[in-house]
Amino acid sequence: MDINPLLYLQAFNNDATTFNTQGHLLEQQSDSPYFDTFANAMQAYLDTKRGGNDEEGTIIIMDDEDFNDSESLEDFLQMLNDEELNDEFSSDDEPEERVNFHEVNHHEVNHHKINHHEVNHHKINQHEPSENPQATFDITEFIKTEDEED
């Protein structure tokens, strides 16, 4: 059974509970049963999407403007990750230009000046992850009962 996450996001779109991209609970103004329903709905989606409740997932409450600008949940989450990565660096820290080695015009390279012992063509930039890091969390970390909050 495939569950559409957008249905859950739309259903709880007007909730006053706000999360950041790391999944920390920033503000909870809704009543506890409503929040528990939201958390259970999100957990059901994660269980279905990821194949079990041991995996981590991302929950974002989108406002209507963000939702309408994004074609899908994946596009929206990628947009958030891109913004988060851009915000992590100041202009002084970030390199001015990143070279994509796959786009280098090899006809302009003078192969006689390359020290082949220092070049490993198969492990270019191996210390950087191949994909953008995903902001994830375990939803069970902040699902609380009223007794635990006191």
Swiss-Prot record:
Sequence repeats lie at residues 101-105, 106-110, 111-115, 116-120, 121-125. The keyword Repeat applies. Residues 101-125 are annotated as: 5 X 5 AA tandem repeats of [FH]-H-[EK]-[IV]-N. Keywords: Repeat. Belongs to the asfivirus D129L family. This is Uncharacterized protein D129L. It comes from African swine fever virus (isolate Tick/Malawi/Lil 20-1/1983) (ASFV).
